[in-house]
Amino acid sequence: MVIGELDGPVGYAIANLIGDQTKGHSRVFAILNCDVQVRPVTLMVSKVTVKSEKYTNILMGTVQAGIANGVLDAVRAGDIPKEKANDLGIIVSVWLDPSVTEIEVDHNILFETNRQATAKAIHKAMHNEPTIDWLLKNQANTTHYFHQLGIEKKL
């Protein structure tokens, strides 16, 4: 997640990303509904190559709505000052497991997961969390989840 002023590098990046679409990695704005874009302007960038209509509909439906609501939750919580909502832009890198097309999806859980994750990421970004002191103190005690699975030969 990147947050910054629309009249600076983040605004420039949003304009470039939305204007330079890449097949399978569409960049879309976070919206509450087809004609209701959230503030701050939030651009979603998929980390997974989109290959199916079902995946697209889940990403551009449930996930998009969850992210949009998470942004507004962050404004409501004061993590993003309401008076800055029209001046800031957010770029969200989105990962949705490609196997989502092969399982029965609980859209309420997927929505809430993305809503809460977005609000939490914004909170951390706006409060400079984790701090460099925390990172240095906890570096040796923090293991990346998938790295650990690899060590345990579970990948």
Located regions from the model:
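Accessory interaction regions appended to the cores of large information-processing enzymes
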Residues: V2-L155
